[in-house]
Amino acid sequence: MKIGIIGGSGLEKSDILLNQEEIEIETPYGKHSPIKKGNLNENEIFILSRHGYNHEITPTKINNRANIYALKKLGCEFVLATTAVGSLRNQIEPGDFLIANQFIDFTKHRNITFYEDFKEGINHTSLAEPFSEKLRDYLIESCTELNFKHHKIGTILTIEGPRFSTRAESFMFRNFAHVVNMSTSPEAILAKEAELEYAVIAMSTDYDCWKKTEEPVTWKIVKEQMEQNSEKVKKLLLKTIEKITNQNTIKADLEFIKSKIRTIPNFPKQGIQFRDITTLLKDPEGMKKVIEILYNRYKDKNIDVIAGIESRGFIIAAILAEKLNASFVPIRKKGKLPAETISETYDLEYGTDTVEIHKDAILPNQNVLLIDDLIATGGTALASCKLIEKLQGKIHEVSFLINLPELKGIQKLSNYKVFTLVDFNNE
């Protein structure tokens, strides 16, 4: 996989990246900032030094179009950008990370789009959600696991530079944003136009100049704080790259799992496409991948009980329960459990059905994972959730191997967290 890193990360100065070399790409927009390529496990990492190795390129003079074009042409799918920011909020202290979810463009003199005309078609790119939610999730998870103080949402306001704000500007900016910098726009705009998964690690270095009890920001303050934070930034990037890599492996595994599920047309009646998991169950590699994905998702969630829905849900739930050292509990159709039960009736297209659980299956406040092989209309799953709640169990998540999105079953479970492995859309 190819991953781009923009800004000062420290990785390019370490021996973590193997086979480092300088890269230069010809672009329609002129010369890009210096790029260094290196290998990290199976990944190719491209580190773009936005301001140059000696910080010789001013914010306004950064050739953002050439930079993003070069990373796209090099084949990067993901881009992690680091940036120093001035905090506009008391709670965002120097040394904190902000994983921004929005930005405001306050620049005036920069080329902000690849689409200077519409000769090849109209393009109005949506920037409603300017940053990759997938990458933001990885960054937030990584900060949490590394125990780094961070803020999960916030708005960056980008100014022109290279000067810092006046005090009046700083007070005004506080009405709009959480932090201020000189780098994020138009970099984020261009990354969105280039269809890159792009996210920003904003490192608070100062309080700009609005806070009278603090010294107004200077380059010296910014540089010193960046140097103090450099090791943390490096660890955060490496942890996030590991998550990106793992997710890419999972994506390939899910495609393999899906390929092992057989579709039988017109079963059990005309017009039904039956998703048959018996072909997956008999495939050791496919089942191993299913259990590994679920195990890695729930291994740190303190699951007490795994409830499986009759009947194919039993298979996955029982195997996973053993691996997680959790109890396995069956949820069955009416009349199939031998001891005292409680029941829940739900509507079918024509008539009703009932599911039951043993009255002593779950203790109050136990953390319960509910599993079935497939979610279609969601009636059975919702009834099963209600059974668990009648016993005062806490539903951690409802997990399915297969989702049939056109039947909208997940919508019935809107009060619960739902996880699915593969979707079948009229295939």
Regions found by a protein language model. Give the residues of each.
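Active-site rim beta-loop-alpha module in soluble metabolic enzymes
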Residues: 130-175
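PRPP-dependent phosphoribosyltransferase catalytic core
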Residues: 253, 257, 382-427
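Metabolite-binding pocket within alpha/beta catalytic cores that recognizes anionic/polar moieties
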Residues: 1-127
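Active-site-facing substrate-recognition patch
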Residues: 252-303
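His/Asp/Glu-rich mid-to-C-terminal helical/loop segments that flank catalytic regions of hydrolases
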Residues: 209-249
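Zn-dependent metallopeptidase/amidohydrolase metal-coordination segment
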Residues: 185-220
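Short glycine-rich phosphate-binding loop at a beta-alpha junction
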Residues: 303-310
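Short, glycine/charge-rich flexible loops or terminal/linker lids adjacent to PRPP-binding catalytic cores
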Residues: 326-368
